[in-house]
Amino acid sequence: MEIKVVKSELNNTISHNGKIGLILLATDQITLYEFDAILKDTGVLCFPSRVMMDSVELTPEVLMAIKNELASATKTILPGMALDVVALSCTSASMTIGVDEVARIIKQSDSKREIKEVTNPYSAIKKACEFLNIDELGVITPYSKEVTQGILDGMQPNIKTISAATFNNTNDNLVPSIHPNSIKDAVIEMAKDEKIKTIFVSCTNLNICRYIDELEKITGKTILTSNQVMAWDILRLAKYKKPILGFGSILEKER
C-alpha cells in the first residue's frame, strides 16, 4: 500500500503565552492540581518533571540533597526546546539550597537550549511582598519547627514575621491530606491578631488555593500561598498581564 504524505501546519496552539518547566518533588500531589485551576485558559502551560528524594521526611538534609537532582530533572523537560520559565516547586528546598544556587543549576543544566527565567515559591513570596509593599507577615507551614525557622530567618531583614504556626508534619506524603478546613482554621485564628495584615501559607503540597478568596473575605487580610505566588511570578516572567480571578487579590492585579 502506498502511504500518502499530507501537508501539516505547524502552529503552537497550547502554550502560545509561555512554556513553563515545572520541577516537582517526588512526593508532590498538589502543585499541578492547583496550577491546572489557576493557569486554565491562559495559554501558559506547564511541562512537569520530578526529582528523586532520599526520604519522604522533609529534613534539612533531605531538602539539601534535592540540589543533586535539579539538573537531570530539568533536562527531561522538552529536550532541545527553549523554556520561558523553569520553576522548582518546593518552598523549603528552595530556601535550604538557596534561590541563587537553584537558578544557577537549572540555567546551566543544558547549554544547548535557552532557559529564560527561573523561579520558585521562596523567591516568589519575597517578590510578591515587594510588589505589594508588604514588610510584615504571619506565616503558617506544615514543616518541622527547624525548617519553619529557616523559612522565617531567610525572610529577614526585608520581611519581618509577626507570628508563626506549624502543623509540624514532616512526612510529605501526608501533607496533602491536611484538610483544607484545618488550614482555614489556622488562617482565621492567626488573622485575629490585628497587627497581622498579611498571612503566608507556605508549602506547595498544601491544598489551599481554591479557598484564598473565601479567606480574604472572612479575615479582611491579604492571603498568600506558595503555589499562588509561584503562579503569579511565572505569569509575571512570562509577561502575561491579564487578571486571574478566584485565587486571591494578588492575581487580580496587573503584573
Task: Provide a role label for each language-model segment.
Residues 224-255:
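C-terminal functional extensions of proteins
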Residues 103-129, 215-230, 234:
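Short, acidic/small-residue loops that bind anionic groups at enzyme active sites
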Residues 66-110, 116-123, 198, 202-209:
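N-terminal glycine-rich phosphate/adenylate-binding segment common to multiple enzyme folds
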Residues 44-48, 138-139, 159-166, 219-227, ...:
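Short hydrophobic/aromatic-enriched beta-strand-loop microsegments
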Residues 186-215, 231:
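Hydrophobic alpha-helical
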